[in-house]
């Protein structure tokens, strides 16, 4: 199986460990991730899509045409990128007039949108194409951790277009997490936004941090060891946001933040250097030390 790997902007610039873990994981699964040469920003669904739908769709469609030239479906592990690319693909496949309008724009770049590929999310590929049984075979170090799963906004919605899971009571990420040996802990307002999306973080950081602070409070009350997400922007909001909340409110949560790819990487036994967790703002060492201690105490560990 081959798939066009759309990186987006935040992951490879701020959290390269997500990409590293993904490449190692998919190599072990026998899935080839093909680089999308010339791909640009997705662009962001809330900001661009709300103010200039035509330009937003044209930029997204251009990215899709790169995958069409490669003859492969697109996979991304950013909810915002997934939202823009999936919704544009759906829109242009359904609306011939809009498709023609976008292709007039793309003609200036020598490209044409044909509607020949699908846009897929990293987690959905793992769940539907790989399967939980295959993933469990790769687990070398079961993770005895309590984690708060954060779904985010664009992974499952709009639900009339995206049919991955129940948008209000999903289980797909919880099931993948528990393959690693970790426990997905329920917490209040689990499906609430992280606070970053829709241009909120850029326009009004205080409002964004109010969202984040509320979610972190609920997670801490649930007694979690780490937060697991499937979007680098959500990841940034929980990671950098904890430092910003400390500065603004004087509150310290100290909850490590891991992308699902990094959590799977830990379960596969990848060293923290490969996961580049040292690039995170919130230190993950306490979480890793807990795993190492449990590993030492495990029967047969010597």
Swiss-Prot record:
Enzyme class: oxidoreductase
Enzyme Commission designation: 1.8.98.5
Pathway: Cofactor metabolism; coenzyme M-coenzyme B heterodisulfide reduction; coenzyme B and coenzyme M from coenzyme M-coenzyme B heterodisulfide: step 1/1
Reactions it catalyzes: coenzyme B + coenzyme M + 2 reduced [2Fe-2S]-[ferredoxin] + 2 H(+) = coenzyme M-coenzyme B heterodisulfide + 2 H2 + 2 oxidized [2Fe-2S]-[ferredoxin]
InterPro entries: CoB/CoM_hetero-S_Rdtase_bsu, Cys_rich_dom, HdrB/HdrD_reductase
GO CC terms: membrane
Cell membrane listed as a keyword: no
Listed GO MF terms: CoB--CoM heterodisulfide reductase activity
Record-linked Pfam families: CCG
GO process annotations (BP): methanogenesis
Keywords attached to this entry: Methanogenesis, Oxidoreductase
Keyword Oxidoreductase included in the entry's annotation: yes
Coiled coil feature spans: none
Record note on quaternary structure: The heterodisulfide reductase is composed of three subunits; HdrA, HdrB and HdrC. It forms a complex with the F420-non-reducing hydrogenase (Mvh), which provides the reducing equivalents to the heterodisulfide reductase.
Family: Belongs to the HdrB family.
Function statement: Part of a complex that catalyzes the reversible reduction of CoM-S-S-CoB to the thiol-coenzymes H-S-CoM (coenzyme M) and H-S-CoB (coenzyme B).
Protein known as: H(2):CoB-CoM heterodisulfide,ferredoxin reductase subunit B
Organism for this UniProt entry: Methanothermobacter marburgensis (strain ATCC BAA-927 / DSM 2133 / JCM 14651 / NBRC 100331 / OCM 82 / Marburg)
């Amino acid at each position: 199986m081959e798939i066009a790997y759309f990186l987006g902007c935040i992951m490879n610039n701020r959290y390269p460990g997500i990409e590293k873990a993904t490449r190692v994981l998919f190599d072990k699964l026998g899935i080839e991730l093909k680089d999308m040469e010339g791909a640009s920003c997705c662009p962001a669904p809330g900001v661009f899509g709300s103010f200039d739908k035509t330009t937003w769709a044209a930029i997204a469609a251009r990215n899709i045409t790169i995958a069409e030239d490669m003859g492969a479906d697109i996979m991304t592990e950013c909810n915002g990128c997934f939202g823009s690319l999936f919704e544009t693909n759906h829109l242009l496949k359904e609306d011939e007039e809009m498709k023609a309008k976008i292709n007039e724009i793309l003609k200036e770049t020598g490209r044409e949108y044909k509607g020949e590929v699908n846009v897929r999310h990293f987690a959905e590929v793992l769940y539907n194409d790989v399967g939980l049984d295959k993933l469990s075979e790769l687990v070398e170090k079961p993770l005895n951790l309590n984690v708060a799963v954060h779904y985010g906004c664009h992974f499952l919605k709009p639900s009339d277009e995206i049919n991955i899971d129940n948008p209000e009571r999903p289980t797909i990420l919880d099931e993948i997490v528990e393959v690693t040996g970790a426990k997905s802990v329920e917490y209040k307002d689990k499906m609430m936004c992280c606070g970053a999306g829709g241009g909120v973080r850029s326009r009004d950081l205080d409002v964004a941090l109010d969202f984040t602070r509320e979610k972190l409070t609920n997670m801490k009350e649930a007694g979690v060891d780490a937060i697991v997400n499937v979007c680098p922007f959500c990841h940034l909001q929980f990671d950098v946001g904890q430092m910003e909340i400390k500065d603004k409110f004087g509150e310290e949560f100290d909850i490590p933040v891991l992308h699902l790819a990094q959590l799977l990487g830990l379960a596969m036994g990848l060293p923290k250097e490969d996961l580049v967790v040292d690039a995170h703002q919130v230190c993950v060492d306490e979480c890793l030390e807990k795993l190492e201690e449990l590993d030492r105490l495990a029967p047969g560990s010597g």
